[in-house]
Regions:
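Shared catalytic-loop signature of beta/alpha-barrel
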Residues: 168
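Active-site entrance/lid segments in N-terminal catalytic domains of soluble metabolic enzymes
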Residues: 1-150, 154-155, 162-165
């Protein structure tokens, strides 16, 4: 991205259970010329997404009569899936083989590596390690906004990402 864009760049970070992955992402972002870091704290666990339940969307996808009919009506989807480039989590592929090839492994990676127990000490560690413009995304209260400033955040981001996760 740094090679093709002269605009400001922000890296969105999630804390991993394996500290070396988090450290590597921060270090690589700095070396790649990112200007700011944003730690996302509002989607650490998957929510109850009611629309997905209504439409039958699952991860990993389940073969149902409806999905089989969709595949049959769109054979190019199946062809592209079977012959195309396999999905990979490029940022962490050197650290893990999870997140490659099939949707199930992406979810396994998120469940195994994203740390739902991360707290203020983790956020402070990331802000200090980054040592530059640092935002906390998903702040939900005035008290949390003040705490974010206290640990070294230079910005906060208020979003409905986590709300959507929790509310469906």
């Amino acid at each position: 991205i740094s090679n093709i864009s002269s605009g400001p760049k922000l890296f969105q970070l999630y804390v991993h259970k394996d500290q070396s992955i988090t450290d590597d992402l921060i270090d690589r972002s700095r070396r790649s010329g990112f200007d700011a870091m944003c730690l996302t704290v509002d989607t650490l666990v998957a929510g109850n997404r009611e629309k997905d339940h209504r439409t039958g969307f699952t991860t990993p996808p389940k073969l149902t009569l409806q999905s089989l009919m969709s595949f049959a009506m769109r054979p190019s989807w199946v062809f592209n899936y079977l012959t195309g480039k396999k999905f990979e989590l490029s940022n962490v592929k050197k650290k893990t083989d999870k997140g490659t090839n099939i949707a199930k492994s992406v979810i396994e990676y998120i469940n195994e590596q994203y740390d739902p127990l991360m707290g203020w000490k983790d956020a402070e560690y990331c802000a200090k390690k980054w040592n530059g413009p640092f935002a906390l995304k998903g702040v939900m209260s005035v008290e949390d906004a003040k705490k974010a400033v206290d640990i070294g955040c230079t910005a906060i981001m208020i979003s409905n990402h986590g709300g959507r996760q929790l509310d469906g």
